[in-house]
A protein has these predicted regions:
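Cleavable N-terminal signal peptides
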Residues: 10-12, 22
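Solvent-exposed loop and beta-edge segments used for protein-protein assembly and interaction
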Residues: 47-51, 121-123, 174-178, 194-198
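Acidic/polar low-complexity flexible segments
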Residues: 84-90, 193-238
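Bacterial N-terminal signal peptides that target proteins for export
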Residues: 1-9
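Short helix-loop boundary/capping segments
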Residues: 133-185
């Protein structure tokens, strides 16, 4: 579903229409009992306040309370994520331009580290920028974009030296009750004003054979808008 909604719209050239039609208020969603409470999105919002952009998602349960079980190995391991797909261009987060769908993701994965500069982050929820693209080999239809062997594309300074278009910036990330929040300095995200967004909770999986696609969207828990139409518009807060 995720891939069909998002990549289909991109192929039709409708992302620009979504940007123009977006509204400057939170995306609100009705609770769904079939969705695990900690991933059942009820509100997603992105605002700019003073010198920061603040991404927030609220859920029906306690945000961050459910984590994937450790498998003891990298291949085939699971990742849980709170995700904000956006209309940002990949060039605005340090990669080459026009590489795919830019999303901010707060993730937990107990079987491996992908922090910048070789740091450890397998035991904490932490933020990433990811660039997504369609791949039919993935159960969810989308992958974090692979870097082919031998290629050396432009990457941001906090790229974790893995063969993916992924960044590991150390943005302040907090979980409090039903909310997860990421605060990003506007000086690092100049294109956020007027951008469009949505909210997603999802599970990802590392390829068991460790080849492309390396990291797939495996299971979409919930999409805030219901149709991934990026109806949110970044607003200026007080």
């Amino acid at each position: 579903m995720f891939a069909k909604l998002l990549t289909g719209a991109l192929a039709a050239g409708t992302l620009s229409l979504w940007v123009g039609a977006a509204h400057s208020h939170p995306i609100e969603a009705k609770p769904v009992e079939a969705v695990t409470a900690s991933f059942d999105i009820i509100e997603t919002v992105v605002v700019t306040k003073k010198d920061k952009a603040i991404f927030t998602t609220r859920v029906r349960g306690t945000a961050g309370s459910d984590k994937p079980a450790a498998t003891g190995k990298f291949e085939g391991s699971d990742v849980y994520a709170y995700v904000w797909p956006t209309s940002l261009n990949s060039g605005e987060i340090g990669f080459e331009r026009d590489q795919g769908i830019v999303a901010l993701a707060v993730t937990f994965h107990p079987d491996f580290d992908d922090a910048a500069y070789g740091g450890r982050n397998r035991d904490v929820w932490h933020p990433h920028w990811v660039v997504l693209n369609e791949d039919k080999a993935c159960k969810g239809g989308l992958k974090v974009t692979d870097i082919p062997n031998g290629q050396k594309p432009k990457v941001p300074p906090t790229w974790p030296k893995v063969p993916l278009l992924i960044d590991s910036p150390d943005y302040p990330t907090t979980f409090k009750g039903d909310a997860v929040e990421v605060s990003i300095p506007l000086s690092l995200l100049g294109g956020i004003g007027g951008a469009s967004f949505d909210g997603v909770t999802a599970g990802l999986k590392v390829n068991g054979n460790l080849h492309s696609p390396l990291l797939c969207v495996d299971n979409v828990f919930k999409v805030a808008s219901g149709n991934l139409s990026l109806p949110g518009k970044v607003a200026t807060g007080k």
